[in-house]
Amino acid sequence: MVQRLTYRRRLSYNTASNKTRLSRTPGNRIVYLYTKKVGKAPKSACGVLPGRLRGVVAVRPKVLMRLSKTKKHVQQGLWWLHVRQVCPDRIKRAFLIEEQKIVVKVLKAQAQSQKAK
């Protein structure tokens, strides 16, 4: 016969805070083990590259208190790995904008030289 399972806590609904998994005890019984909620790393604030920050531990807020500062912050080297995907586009865009400014100046100079003649 199949063993029946009951929750170990008072909350009897399948909510986000009451998630469980099955576990077999040394006495060969199957019981519920309550799982922790999954943590997420902080989002990128740069606005250009979406997604979560790499190099920051993805844990729940209460666990962050116990972590050392190096695990909660991105070092400069890791930040560059995050941004380097965006930088070539920024460099190209800046170069093209400067080229466009030069073209406008040349066209203005040509127009003035045409008027002078």
UniProtKB/Swiss-Prot annotation:
Keyword terms, alphabetized: Acetylation, Cytoplasm, Endoplasmic reticulum, Isopeptide bond, Phosphoprotein, Ribonucleoprotein, Ribosomal protein, Ubl conjugation
GO molecular function, one term: structural constituent of ribosome
Function statement: Component of the large ribosomal subunit. The ribosome is a large ribonucleoprotein complex responsible for the synthesis of proteins in the cell.
PANTHER family for this protein: 60S RIBOSOMAL PROTEIN L34
One CC-aspect GO term: cytosolic large ribosomal subunit
Keyword set includes Ubl conjugation: yes
This protein's name: Large ribosomal subunit protein eL34
Membership in a protein family: Belongs to the eukaryotic ribosomal protein eL34 family.
Keyword Ribonucleoprotein: yes
Location of N6-acetyllysine modifications: K36, K43
Protein localization: Cytoplasm, Cytosol; Cytoplasm; Endoplasmic reticulum
Covalent cross-link site, Glycyl lysine isopeptide (Lys-Gly) (interchain with G-Cter in SUMO2): K108
PROSITE patterns tied to this protein: RIBOSOMAL_L34E
Modification type Phosphoserine: residues: S12
GO terms classed as biological process: translation
Alphabetical list of InterPro entries matching this protein: Ribosomal_eL34 (IPR008195), Ribosomal_eL34_C_sf (IPR038562), Ribosomal_eL34_CS (IPR018065)
Assembly with partners or alone: Component of the large ribosomal subunit.
Species, as recorded: Rattus norvegicus
Source organism superkingdom: Eukaryota
